[in-house]
Amino acid sequence: EQGYHDIHSELTASDTERLTDEEKAFILNNFFSSKFETMIYRSENYKNLYQKRFSKDVATLEDFSAQELSDLMALFNLVWIDPAHFARYPRLEELWEKQYNYTQEDRIEILSIQKSIIREIIPTYKKYIEEGRIELSTSPYYHAILPILIDVKASVKSVLTTEGLPANLGMLDDAKYQIKSALDRIEEIFGVRPKGMWPPELCLGPKTLGLLSKAGVKWTISDEGVLANSINFDFIRDFKGNLNDPYHLLKVYEYQTKENSIDIIFRDRSIPNLINFEYAGINPKMAAGDLYEKIKMIQNKLLVSPDKTHLLTIASDCENCWENYQNDGIEFLENIYSLIENDESLETVLI
């Protein structure tokens, strides 16, 4: 009746006095799915409920009152809202400060604010696209690994064993459909046809590049390991992970197909790993400073380059990392963006 389409929202909006045992079990098994150090720990009540749930091997349904289940669902939804939105929605701050004795009406209000935030996403992206501040790329519609669909026999060159692979998958038409459907859908939603496409698992091959180019894709991306194999070059790093020679990695490569051409950029592998797995655990200002120093070190090594400009690609295909940061990484992002923005020798660009 409230228009919810997922079990988490349906339960959040429900009357906790009328929950079935099955629903209570689902809540206890799923509404603690939050990072403890950066999300659960922020709330004294949420932390206490977590400890009650996991302090013994088996927590029975009878251990939790209807009010505790109500608080659990309210706090779960609140910690998954980016802290930046609390300043924009004062009511969120009021609901967060409450911490205890949440009502069904409170929980429904939290869901309503969530919907308001979600409704802003597409208009905000459209605005930034129109202003030239961002560029959208897409992936094949169902995240298909294109080289396997196009030619599984060619793909076996990159795997250790062919066991379990079909003899000849032969799904070229499906690969074309995956590409076109993704481009069409993004254009339908945002009013702009993407120029770039992110290949799932960063897998590329000559036939894949040909299909992308024929579909109107202007650029795509892969990993430094793919580039190393393609140009027979070893990207050697020092003990801190800095490239000894970054020149080849900071270029845009043009691949000529039979009919067209497509640009390929290759990401630095080390920097995304730092953002995804290391920087969350240190002071955000220090983390931003370390990243900035690495960028400047790369820049300094290119002072004798014959090229006037170079492109450092920082691209992550990891699961969302920001929940590992305090405040969803706001301080880290603000610091690194500020450092880059105030450096006249650096410029963020569209591809």
Predicted regions and their residues:
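CE4/NodB-like, metal-dependent polysaccharide N-deacetylase domain
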Residues: G164-E201, K296-A315
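Conserved, mostly hydrophobic/aromatic
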Residues: S137-S139, M197, L212, I265, ...
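Short, solvent-exposed turn/loop segments enriched in Gly/Ser/Thr/Pro and often Arg
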Residues: E1, P140-H143, G196-G205, G225
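C-terminal domain-boundary segment and adjacent tail
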Residues: W219-R237, L249-V252, A288-I351
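N-terminal catalytic cores of secreted or lumenal carbohydrate-active enzymes
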Residues: E1-V159
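Acidic (Asp/Glu)-rich catalytic clusters
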Residues: P123-T138, K153-S155, L212-K214, E254-N260, ...
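Acidic, His- and aromatic-enriched active-site or binding-groove loops in soluble protein domains
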Residues: Q2-E37, V156-K176, S213-Q256
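Glycine- and acidic
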Residues: T103-I108, K157-M171, G191-K195, P272-G281, ...
